[in-house]
UniProtKB/Swiss-Prot annotation:
Widely expressed. This is KxDL motif-containing protein 1. Transmembrane segments: none annotated. One of its GO terms (biological process) is regulation of endosome size. The modification N-acetylmethionine is found at residue 1. Keywords: Acetylation, Lysosome, Membrane. Residues 125-145 have a biased composition (Polar residues).
């Protein structure tokens, strides 16, 4: 009888003869090609990820800058409209007959219907470490600071006027119609 060494050798020899070395080499080559492709793809994805994170940071900064600008503009416009309402109220108290045909609610409006949500201002305040915005607008409106401001101080109280000129009876009738 054959020895156990010879039986195992025969079995291994037959098992190895069943495997085609060309097929094994082709599989190894295909695996190397796939590995190269995966490494290149991985490198491209890493580059894309890095580029995307840089762009996201840039766009986030721009978005925050534009958001701050819009919030500042809204705050400035609110201040301007509040001043206009205050001036209208003062003029209405000083010259009630000039404002008699205008309903009181139309020139003494409350704050806007859509105020800035606190979450936006909180987000802006917490996301930046700035010294704050500088409000250069004056607290009171004066003729010397506001170009185009019409000085109405020379008009006598109780006389309706448009553009600094007193109206005649004929003109009043045409403006009331």
């Amino acid at each position: 009888m054959d020895t156990p060494d010879s039986a195992s050798r025969v079995f291994c020899g037959r098992f190895l003869s069943m495997v085609n070395t060309d097929d094994v080499n082709a599989i190894i080559l295909a695996q190397k090609n796939m590995l190269d492709r995966f490494e290149k793809t991985n490198e491209m994805l890493l580059n894309f990820n890095n580029l995307s994170s840089v762009r996201l940071q840039q766009m986030s900064e721009r978005f925050m800058h534009h958001t701050r600008t819009l919030v500042d503009m809204k705050r400035d416009l609110d201040s301007i409209f509040r001043r206009i309402r205050t001036l209208k109220g003062k003029l209405a108290r000083q010259h009630p007959e000039a404002f008699s045909h205008i309903p009181e609610g139309s020139f003494l409006e409350d704050e806007d219907e859509d105020p800035i949500p606190p979450s936006i201002t909180t987000t802006i305040a917490t996301s930046e470490q700035s010294t704050g915005s500088c409000d250069t607008s004056p607290d009171t409106v004066s003729p010397s600071l506001s170009p185009g401001f019409e000085d109405l101080s020379h008009i006598q109280p109780g006389s309706p006027a448009i553009n600094g000129h007193r109206q005649t009876d004929d003109e009043e009738e045409t403006h009331e119609e």
